[in-house]
Structure formats: C-alpha cells, structure tokens
C-alpha cells in the first residue's frame, strides 16, 4: 500500500512540475510587457493610460470573463486536453503581439492571451486537488504557483537582456515579416516555449476524479445556489483577493518602469534586479506561505489558508506605501523586495 502511495505521489509531483512550467510560461507571456513600456509607447505614440489598457484591461477583463465558463468545461471534461489547447492559443497570440501594427491589433492579441490563460489555473488546481491528499495540498499548490514568480522573474531578466541587445542593433530584418523592432522580436521569441510545454503535457495522465464525480453533470442552478448560500464568505474572499491582486499586478507591471523613471536604471538593469527579486523572494514567499498554512491546518486551524493571506496582505502594506516616499534606489529595491515576498 505504501509503495502504491509513493508511486502515485511520484506521478503527482511530475504533474505539478509540468503544470509549474506551464504557469511559468503563462507569466512570462503575461508580464513581459512590463519592460516594454517605453518601446511600445514610442512605436504607437500612446500614453501611459493607453498602455495600461493593453497590459491590464485587454488581458484581465477577458481573463476574468472566460474563467468561469472554462472552469465549467474543466469540471466536466478532460482537463489535460483543455490546458494543452489553451497553452497553444495563448502562445500563438503572444507571438502575434509582436506583429501588431497598432493599438487595437495589439489589444486584440492581448485579449487572446487572456482567454487562453484563463483555463490554466482552474484546470490545474482541479488536477492537483485530485492527485494529492488534502494535507499536502498547500505545498503542492505552492510549488505550482512558483511558476508565477519564476515566470515573472524570467520575463524581466530575459526581457531586459533582449531589449538591451535590441537597443544596440536597432531594427531586425526577419524574412517574411520585414523589419521588426526589438520588442516585437521579444514577443515572438517568448511565444515559442508554450508550444513545447503543450506537447510535454501529453506525457501526463489525467488524475482520477473522486468516486462519483463527473459521472452526473451538476446543473448550473445548483452551482449558483451553492454560491448564493455562501455569498458572504465567498463575496468577501473574492473582493479581498481581487483588491490584493490589483495591487500586486500593478507592482509587477510597473515595477521595472518605477526603477527606470525614479532612479534612472537602464531597462536591462531594471529587468535583472526586479527579475531577481521576483524569482528569489517571490519563490521564498510562496514556499513559506504554503508551508505555514499546511502546518496550521494540520494543528486544527481550519481557517489557516485565508488567515495566511490576510496576514501577508497586512505585512505587504508598509512596503507598498514606502514606494511612493523613498528617494534612494536601495530603499526602492528594499520596498519592492518586501512587497514581493509578502504578496507571494
């Protein structure tokens, strides 16, 4: 029995590893725009506000709208195939961002990225919850979510290097596409790995659902009744996490630009420093949060997971506020580091 359990957990951790790579890829494709504020604004002649619509609204609105219907498909269908299709979609749309010739074509490409990525987490969390015992879920989901910090960090580190290189060579002639600026080539390059990860998912087995689950479709009316009966708890949770995520993603998108505009960093230097913060402290925060929540839950604290989120948000607050007051680069980096650790 113990051998069977160990073998099952081995395949479960393999599943988490592949899903973490998918999450990493999704955040590279999602966050790479944070280093391209200047080049994109210059190419299209747009303001910071219109850039924010491209980086934020175009992605997040349709990411949110498509989350529920795609989650419904994940509940009733093959989650592995759903993720494979959606990874392919967002990867192609990321590459197409590099071919956009104006604000609206880039907006539509970002919408495609958001729609594709909307399926990943609902399906991934469902697969992980079926593959692991409850006492190990906190650590397993934290490892999966490490893709957020790895992806964001790699987006800034590699993006900074590419943009720094592109600034020295100007435009690049690509057969079939004509002259491309560095930021366009960056989008096309980062869109490729997702297609490879989609193929890797073909080696993963669909975890068995709990006995009886999925045999009879649950009517949407019952799902809505379940939510309505718990509207206070779910409403507070959704609103609270949404506000927290709004702050977190604001920092993630504008963090490098904050370093460039406030302290005079070059894009390459800002990307390397902010990317390192994301990878090291973001990953540490994720592992710490998951480990602490698992330990508290094992000791009988049923509210361990939302409690960790609450405490982390409160600890993050002074670092976020400090970003608007500090005047030295090292203090700015310290505030970004603290905010990143506790937000993870």
Language-model features and meaning:
Residues 304-344:
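C-terminal transmembrane helical hairpin of 12-TM major facilitator-type secondary transporters
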Residues 144, 148-202:
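Helix-loop-helix hairpin linking two adjacent transmembrane segments in secondary transporters
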Residues 33-34, 232-286, 343-344:
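Extracytoplasmic gate region of multi-pass secondary transporters
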Residues 2-9, 206-237, 262:
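Juxtamembrane intracellular "pre-TM" segments in multi-pass secondary transporters
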Residues 45, 78, 99-105, 133, ...:
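Helix-breaking motifs and short loop linkers at transmembrane-helix boundaries and internal kinks
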Residues 34-65:
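Extracellular/periplasmic helix-loop-helix junction of adjacent transmembrane segments
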Residues 65-101:
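Conserved MFS/SLC helix-loop-helix module at the cytosolic interface between two early adjacent transmembrane helices
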Residues 109-148:
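Cytoplasmic helix-loop-helix junction between adjacent transmembrane helices
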């Amino acid at each position: 029995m113990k051998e069977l359990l160990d073998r099952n957990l081995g395949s479960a951790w393999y599943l988490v590893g592949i899903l973490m790579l998918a999450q990493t890829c999704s955040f590279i494709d999602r966050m790479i725009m944070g280093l391209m504020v200047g080049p994109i604004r210059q190419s299209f002649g747009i303001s910071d506000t219109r850039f924010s619509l491209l980086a934020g609204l175009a992605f997040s609105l349709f990411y949110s709208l498509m989350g529920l219907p795609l989650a419904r498909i994940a509940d009733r269908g093959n989650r592995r195939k759903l993720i494979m299709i959606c990874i392919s979609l967002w990867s192609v749309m990321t590459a197409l961002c590099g071919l956009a010739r104006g604000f609206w074509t880039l907006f539509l490409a970002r919408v495609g990225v958001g729609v594709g990525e909307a399926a990943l987490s609902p399906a991934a969390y469902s697969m992980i919850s079926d593959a692991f015992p409850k006492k190990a879920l906190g650590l397993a989901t934290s490892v999966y979510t490490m893709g957020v910090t790895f992806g964001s960090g790699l987006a800034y580190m590699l993006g900074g290097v590419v943009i720094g290189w592109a600034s020295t060579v100007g435009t690049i002639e690509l057969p079939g596409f004509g002259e491309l600026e560095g930021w366009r080539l960056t989008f096309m390059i980062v869109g490729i790995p997702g297609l490879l990860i989609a193929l890797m998912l073909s080696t993963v087995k669909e975890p068995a659902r709990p006995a009886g689950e999925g045999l009879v479709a649950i009517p949407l009316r019952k799902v809505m009744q379940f939510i309505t009966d718990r509207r206070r708890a779910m409403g507070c949770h959704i609103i609270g996490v949404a506000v927290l995520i709004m702050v977190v993603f604001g920092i993630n998108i504008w963090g490098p630009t904050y370093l460039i505009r406030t302290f005079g960093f070059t894009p390459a230097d800002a990307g390397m420093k902010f990317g390192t913060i994301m990878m090291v402290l973001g990953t540490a925060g994720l592992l710490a949060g998951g480990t602490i929540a698992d330990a508290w839950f094992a000791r009988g604290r049923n509210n361990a997971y939302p409690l960790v989120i609450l405490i982390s948000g409160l600890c993050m607050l002074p670092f976020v506020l400090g970003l608007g007051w500090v005047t030295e680069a090292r203090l700015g980096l310290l505030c970004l580091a603290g905010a990143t650790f506790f937000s993870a």
